[in-house]
Amino acid sequence: MARSGKKARRLVVDGQTFLWSLGHSHRALGGGYYEDCCETVVIRLFKARGRLHIVFRQGPDRLVPDGYMMPSGAVGTAEGNVNLHEPGTARALLDAALAQGWQPDDPLVKEIDGWTLFGAAARRHSAAGASD
């Protein structure tokens, strides 16, 4: 049975359970055209109210899926690319956010520009590929 794409996935880190999911948003222009595509990874500590939104917005030299030639969850720059559907990528983003001071038990929603964490995730992705 396939996993539901809408349901949050579990990620256990140092004995703590986090839930994470991936979403896509954009602004519809009409006629089947869209702009301002954005991928958002949402991470939260299990049973906590606060959430972390890691947002990857489209921009110069920043690739975000727009429905044409890029698969869902793929984001990239000249530095590399990552698949936001992969648990290893979610873990790398979580680790980078924690290193920047995100507090998982904070009851507020915090938004972080995903591109500030991208380098750490891309390096981890490259290292994992090299060890395969």
Predicted features by range, described:
Residues A8, T17, C38-T40:
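Broad gene-expression machinery/nucleic-acid interaction feature
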